[in-house]
Amino acid sequence: MARPRAATYDDQRSQILRAAADLFARRGYTAATLNEVASASGVSKATLYHYFSDKHALLEDIVSSHVARLQGIAAEAGAPPTEPPGSTHGAAEARLRRLVRRFMQAYADAQSEHRVLTEDVKFLDERARGAVLDGQRQVVAAFAQGIAACRPDLRAELHKPMAMLLFGMINWTFTWLRPDGVLTPADLGDIVVDLFFGGLPAVAATLAPAQADARPPELR
């Protein structure tokens, strides 16, 4: 189904990008055509070319914009606030928990874009792929710094591997976490952090009452 037409240049450009991301995620980058992107966006092919020179340009914008959003979240949620000297270890854990929760929500809000990033980045040319990979490294570094703040006793060479293990728990949740399911992205983010910090014994046996009561009756 074609999307409604956007009112402004930026709105229409964003509309085309979102439609292309949905299409690439559903059909695959190589199978999707610009005619299909134009149709899904509710624009003519000529209008599509006004914004993007080719399919590669669409792919590059989708993945680079998504990574830039993740970088912004990492910078905002992972940055330590102004704290007095000797601030508690618990503050560092709270920042890492906030970071994971924000990433889980970002993945849920941009499932198509995240799928395109994980599956289609290999189709970018060397320059564009390098820029995206640099952005991803910065995101991993932000997580590694968060882990180091939680465990300052860890050897420095363990910070990145620990961050990659944490990403291993969250990066593919978009493939199975249902928007109408029992767990919200924030719920699952908390479980991930509990599991990461404490292992299986640290995971709560049930959802907190407030979380459980917020679910639709049919899911209780």
Predicted regions and their residues:
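Amphipathic alpha-helical segments used for helix-helix packing
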Residues: 107-127, 175
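Key DNA-contact positions within bacterial/archaeal DNA-binding proteins
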Residues: 46
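N-terminal intrinsically disordered/low-complexity leader segments
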Residues: 1-11, 18, 81-84, 204-220
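Basic, helix-initiating cap at the start of DNA-binding domains
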Residues: 1-27, 31-43, 56-60, 65, ...
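Hydrophobic alpha-helical segments that form the core
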Residues: 102, 156-175, 186-199, 220
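Hydrophobic alpha-helical connector segments
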Residues: 61, 75-109, 163-166
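Amphipathic alpha-helical packing segments from all-alpha helical-bundle domains
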Residues: 68-74, 126-151, 160-164, 187-190, ...
